[in-house]
Amino acid sequence: MTQSTASAHKTPVVTRTAEEIQALRPQLGRLALVPTMGALHTGHRSLIAQAREHAESVAVSIFVNPLQFGPNEDYDRYPRTFDHDLRVCAEEGVDVVFAPTVDVMYPDADGDSLGQIVTVDPGSMGRVLEGEFRPGFFHGVLTVVNKLFNLIRPDVAVFGQKDAQQLAVVRRMVRDLCLPVTIVAAPTVRDPDGLATSSRNVYLSAEERASALALSKALFAGADAASSGPAAVLAAARAILSEAARATPPVSVDYLALVDPTTFTEVGDDYRGDAVLAVAAWVGETRLIDNVPLTL
């Protein structure tokens, strides 16, 4: 399957087991993988388009990974829309979809015994920001990504800048474990109102969505202040988030941080160079994350 034969609205091959995807792999040539949890949206379409630029064939994995959800998180209600996802993949000319069950990905674990399986430790980078507020999250992410790499054997994998810390942690895993995969970052896709596309946006009511726009507004305000240094960036963003905390419904911030894009350590006021301004917040029962890259 070559780039020239890829066409929109073709039906991708659906594989569900390790044996099926591995039997197909020799036919795929240079392969780019887009790992997803399904509920595909315009952001995922952008990732698929980016993947197409780097390989002959494109694979999309669809797997809601229980290992990256905490005990009080939204694993059970996370959107599962396989028929819709398959239509999106067909429209985008995806060659193969890998949609395993939990039993395929974690054959010796069920329910509570998930905690007994061997996982990939994310190191110190995976214990700050998202790792602090969602303990075990990056263990789950890196473990499933590593398993997908081993099963599918892609040459390239595409991740969104919208999940900037995840992108950085995956890059570190690939480097430290000498994995033969090139990681490509795709820019964040936003809806016309500025909200970063996310599968969790479907949880938001109209009023909650209006409040949630404070996240992107805060980030853009911070980016506009970048020439004045880190303190000005954070002050500009905090001003908007403080106002949003008094809105109806309110925005409740988990963190706002200005970090080094490689290590995700917070930068000091004398820092100059590339950085990421990242935010996580709750609007109603929905937790959203967003970020913008900037140069100080």
Swiss-Prot record:
It comes from the Bacteria. ATP binds at residues 37-44, 160-163, 189, 197-200. Its main location: cytoplasm. Pathway: Cofactor biosynthesis; (R)-pantothenate biosynthesis; (R)-pantothenate from (R)-pantoate and beta-alanine: step 1/1. (R)-pantoate binds at Q68, Q166. Its EC number is 6.3.2.1. One of its GO terms (molecular function) is pantoate-beta-alanine ligase activity. It is found in: Cytoplasm. It catalyses: (R)-pantoate + beta-alanine + ATP = (R)-pantothenate + AMP + diphosphate + H(+). One of its GO terms (cellular component) is cytosol. The keyword Ligase applies. Beta-alanine binds at Q68. InterPro entries: Cyt_trans-like, Pantoate_ligase, Pantoate_ligase_C, Rossmann-like_a/b/a_fold. Belongs to the pantothenate synthetase family. Catalyzes the condensation of pantoate with beta-alanine in an ATP-dependent reaction via a pantoyl-adenylate intermediate. The reaction proceeds by a bi uni uni bi ping pong mechanism. Homodimer. This is Pantothenate synthetase. It comes from Thermobifida fusca (strain YX). The gene is panC.
